[in-house]
């Protein structure tokens, strides 16, 4: 939530909502081509073989042909890597990878940053794989320079970023102006900056991103003209702004018609300890108590699925919103996620104030939310903000903390939203449960249902989790959430949080666990 400016089941999951993976293809056998080796003890006058390796990543990138693999031996490479060549569908990708299990480290210590620049930087590239590296220590202390761990930009297809460890990418400058801008960095950034040509068929999987100093930017972001992607099985933690962000309407694409991330899957990720409270881009007096950083955020994206993720100990667990007036986040499905212990709220939707955009035609289904709103601010488990239209909120478990706030919606710009088949529970019992809907407060579960017309089939009961002290929010066999949901196969998905088949009884369970 920028208040200042700014898993393996991929194909099947997307097919459920008719969101295609486009041309994402199964592996193809290619004809033999030349592979290359890089070592800290090598020389760029060598042949690039295992016995006579190159010294620099860049030289290997300059000579690699479609289908080549560049094997990087263990060691520290204080170098940038600029990738402008491409693999091909016929010959295969160009792959950059560590050699066997050796620790190949790309270290930015002392390297300059020019504009927005990745220490690994892909421009208009196609059929490229970057995997198995540790990428670290790329920093700037200068306003309006943006260091990035891996930066993919322009247009391109079939880009895979896998199993990299990215940390200590930082901008430590002092933000400027009334909107506190100019302090920005990313761990991974994919910017579709052309039109109509997009960046498409992007796979970002198995990476770890941590200890990032981001200012008003994000840990892992897709922005602009990006179409067809998967962000799966990543671990993102201990950063000072948003974990995963899908963005539209920021002007990254030269055409407004294409300036929106779309047709993607965010699944199987674990995002935790994400907070803006010590980030001066949200207020220079630290801690600023902004509580504005989402674990997972969709800001103007569309036609995508957020499923089977864990988001906890962040400012906000998951948010689907639009920061731009007159624009909307649309057709996003948030399902089968575990969201717990977040400071402001569990799931938020709608513009964060009445100068923002809207959330339209989205689904929030089969999620488990447990004791979010840990700061006691009253945003509750589900925070329904400005301008929400025609959304579905069903089959979720909402367990409140000490405030007993379940849903908080202070705006009257709320129309066509369907809320039903949810399970609620809180320490004060049904009579003390607090709800705000269309700026009307209701104390008590019965008063809320009769006053709003919501949740005719909802329950107020202890969901009987396995072990909350161990954050195990699976259901005991005696849970009232078992078989108590609404079985709408068009939206509930094929798998639960653990990858087990949905609907094993008479009806779907309420919550993330089947």
Model regions and ranges:
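Sec-dependent N-terminal signal peptides of Gram-positive bacterial secreted proteins and lipoproteins
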Residues: 2-24
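Right-handed parallel beta-helix/beta-solenoid
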Residues: 23, 28-58, 76, 100-102, ...
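Acidic Gly/Asp/Thr-rich repetitive segments characteristic of extracellular carbohydrate-active
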Residues: 40-78, 82, 448, 479, ...
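Extracellular beta-strand-rich solenoid/capping regions of secreted or surface-exposed proteins
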Residues: 58, 62-66, 78-95, 104-131, ...
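Short glycine/acidic-rich loop motifs that flank beta-strands on beta-rich extracellular proteins
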Residues: 77-82, 108-119, 139-148, 170-186, ...
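Predominantly extracellular beta-rich ligand-binding scaffolds that present long acidic/polar faces
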Residues: 80, 84-85, 91, 114, ...
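Right-handed parallel beta-helix
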Residues: 93, 99-103, 126-137, 157-170, ...
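C-terminal accessory segments
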Residues: 446-514
